[in-house]
């Protein structure tokens, strides 16, 4: 009987993930502790917390290993660091995002009934943020039919990545419009920007949501910039950059889209009680990641990393051969401080926006400053974000100083390398940008088989083969008939 119950529970959860089945639960499936009347504020706070837990989990468990931030201390075969990416390598992000997108839809619907456009705008921002991560990770994913459980659709079709992006741009435009007249969130619940009625400067804080919407759109437009002929990317970028009053962007670190863990129940940093064996001993920073920081005397090391041998920051190889043995405690890993650090819940930072502007300025867009000025602001902002005082002369030293007379490609490489470090714990953005630009250039470990290529996507979770076989099959056919990690997405080609 217990086995049958577990199987039934698995099927129920999986169906909820696939089709966001959140309505019409029977009484036996209703949480007795859940309020009968759900307000937008109750939905928002829990959703905000769980979203960043999922995103930073994907950073630590997948993105960091793939992008040579960390590598497993012990690995005799396979592994993401050797470019072996399977359906289970990152399936948690699919499960988490689709579960939480049901909450986004509920927030949108509930707010609509109450005519609370500001809550609806926030729901659209979370929708764009989460779906952009999903489609950048997998390619075509359920989108237009993903929220139709109430209509009986438990097997949603997969939408083309292009169509998803086009709709998300429209959603962000709607959010920007609805937030143009900021007012406090009547039902509270905002733990990101504190746009709550009982918060000082709530109207100022609500304006930050609008800046996030437009900054996120700029990120996404740059992501698909190779497809300018199919989507009017350059026109939309120019419109945002030249109309600050209509499309306000982040202006400083105070605008960072970060869920700052308060350190109180129930919103603890998800790693606050992680065992040392799981947090530090199983993974170490790589030589690629640490050696650059050592060479630059990067002050963020003290925030991010442990030391060994009386203050040394040391990394291990990534993609190493099977006979390599890394001794426990001999190399640097995540610092204990990160486990309780409030600012770990990153969605998008001001530092990232400055690096986006640096690249756009390099490509000829009018941003108001030079590529170098944006580059230096990006580095400075990242230091401030992590509470790492920047040493005097840091920006002018060899290895950091911007080379404005170098080739355009070399300048882009400089920008992207610093952006890579600024992406620390920002879901899988470093991977997405590596696929778009080719930077940073990662060394290929001696233990990576010659046949293994740097992945462009994650294969779909295996449980979809039984829960949504027809539409999964159609999605696989659309990418060439083989569900593997080397198939490039629409914006990457």
Show which residues each predicted segment covers.
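Short, surface-exposed acidic
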Residues: 390-392, 402
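Bacterial Sec-dependent N-terminal signal peptides
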Residues: 1-30
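Structured, solvent-exposed acidic/aromatic patches
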Residues: 37-38, 72-126, 132-388, 405-412, ...
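Long, intrinsically disordered, low-complexity segments
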Residues: 21, 198, 270-295, 301-305, ...
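Surface-exposed intrinsically disordered loops and tails
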Residues: 201-202, 393-396
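Membrane-proximal, proline-rich intrinsically disordered regions
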Residues: 21-74, 88, 98, 106, ...
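Generic recognition of cysteine residues
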Residues: 15-16, 137, 284, 458
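Short alpha-helical linear motifs
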Residues: 146-148, 261-266, 396-400, 436-441
